[in-house]
Swiss-Prot record:
Protein name per Swiss-Prot or TrEMBL: Probable GTP 3',8-cyclase
Recorded name of the encoding gene: moaA
Gene Ontology MF terms in the entry: 4 iron, 4 sulfur cluster binding; cyclic pyranopterin monophosphate synthase activity; GTP 3',8'-cyclase activity; GTP binding; metal ion binding; S-adenosyl-L-methionine binding
Signal peptide, first to last residue: none
Chain positions recorded as GTP binding sites: R13, K60, T90, K151, R249, I250, R251
Positions annotated to bind [4Fe-4S] cluster 2: C244, C247, C261
Annotated cofactor note: Binds 2 [4Fe-4S] clusters. Binds 1 [4Fe-4S] cluster coordinated with 3 cysteines and an exchangeable S-adenosyl-L-methionine and 1 [4Fe-4S] cluster coordinated with 3 cysteines and the GTP-derived substrate.
Task of the protein: Catalyzes the cyclization of GTP to (8S)-3',8-cyclo-7,8-dihydroguanosine 5'-triphosphate.
Cofactors demanded by this protein: [4Fe-4S] cluster
Chain ranges of the Radical SAM core domain: 4-224
Record-stated family: Belongs to the radical SAM superfamily. MoaA family.
One Pfam family from the record: Radical_SAM
InterPro entries per UniProt: Aldolase_TIM (IPR013785), Elp3/MiaA/NifB-like_rSAM (IPR006638), MoaA_arc (IPR013485), MoaA_NifB_PqqE_Fe-S-bd_CS (IPR000385), MoaA_twitch (IPR010505), MoCo_biosynth_MoaA/MoaC (IPR050105), rSAM (IPR007197)
Binding residues annotated for S-adenosyl-L-methionine, in chain numbering: G64, S114
Length: 313
């Protein structure tokens, strides 16, 4: 199904929990407020199953830290059972060394692992946890288990810009498939720490000189730089109408809302009462369909082109 700006929805991002065993100072918290309510595996899979009718093909599990959900394996299994083609997860990686093979076995396809420093002291300063060795171990185990392409997420700030070369070399040597250089943006805790914002333009200039090949990813018009067997992708979502023009995501919050945009809290459809109301399964499915249709109808880019025609030529 296409929204009024010509954008399809193909990816459902599901926040499994707001709880995290890290405390990164810039966390955007998926643009959500803290909530104690958690959707069950059955509720998540039902929303995803109905979403397939509207174009959903992939589900990204996020948090908080999704590996803290004790029913994570069941959630992944049920998403696969209802027909989701790709299930991926963003994680801090600290529990990945013990979970990687189990995750692969139940159907998880790939992971994004957040890694913002290879210096132990700086890692602890950024995350609040002395766990760098465990994260590195988790990355290596995930690669062995076949959770690929394995992608590293590196949020660039004034604190860790000196770490970038080390991160690139580590990624190449370890067999990481992609490295995402992510611009700090003022959402969640990032609103209070934007003083650490570091522009990516100077980094891109260096990457252009070092890259074996450069291509532009059609979705979001992101540049991708090839260094040896590593792909480095630059992610600049904030105040970026090109990023919004290519957005194919809709979000399911931990407390049961369909959220149409990371940056907006005024365009959400609360479906918790549907999921937990006294309705038959058929009635729930029909009401969730209506919720998707409303969400798609009100969905709009947060950052727009200042022209009549929205999509870039």
């Amino acid at each position: 199904m296409i929204d009024r700006f010509g954008r399809s929805i193909e990816d459902l991002r599901v926040t499994l929990t707001h709880v995290c065993n890290f405390s990164c100072f810039f966390c955007h918290m998926e643009g959500e407020d803290n909530s104690q309510s958690l959707l069950s595996p059955e509720e998540i899979s039902l929303v995803a199953k109905v979403g397939i009718e509207y174009g959903i093909r992939s589900v990204k599990l996020t948090g908080g830290e999704p590996t803290l959900r004790r029913d994570l394996l069941q959630i992944i299994r049920e998403l696969k059972d209802v027909g989701i083609k790709e299930v991926s997860m963003t994680t801090n990686g600290v529990l990945l060394s013990t979970l990687a093979w189990k995750l692969k076995e139940v159907g998880l396809d790939r992971v994004n692992v957040s890694l913002h420093s290879l210096d132990k002291q700086l890692f602890k300063e950024i995350t609040g946890v002395d766990a760098l060795d465990k994260v590195i171990e988790g990355i290596k185990e995930a690669i062995k288990a076949g959770l690929r392409p394995l992608k590293l997420n590196f949020v660039l700030t004034k604190k860790n810009i000196s770490q970038l070369d080390n991160i690139i070399n580590f990624a190449i040597e370890t067999g990481v498939d992609e490295l995402h250089l992510i611009e700090l943006h003022p959402v969640g805790l990032g609103k209070n720490t934007f003083e650490y914002h570091e522009k990516l333009e100077s980094i891109e200039k260096i990457l252009k000189e070092r890259a074996d090949k450069i291509e532009i990813r059609s979705k979001h018009y992101r540049p991708r730089y090839y260094l040896n067997n590593l792909v480095i992708e630059v992610v600049k979502p904030y105040a970026n109408p090109i990023f919004c023009a290519g957005c194919n995501r809709i979000r399911l919050t931990a407390d049961g809302k369909l959220k149409t945009c990371l940056y907006r809290q005024d365009k959400e459809i609360d479906i918790m009462d549907i999921l937990r109301g006294d309705f038959s399964l058929e009635e729930k499915i029909e009401l969730i369909r209506e919720a998707y249709e409303i969400a798609i109808a009100i969905r709009e880019p947060n950052f727009k082109y200042k022209v009549e025609s929205y999509a870039p030529s």
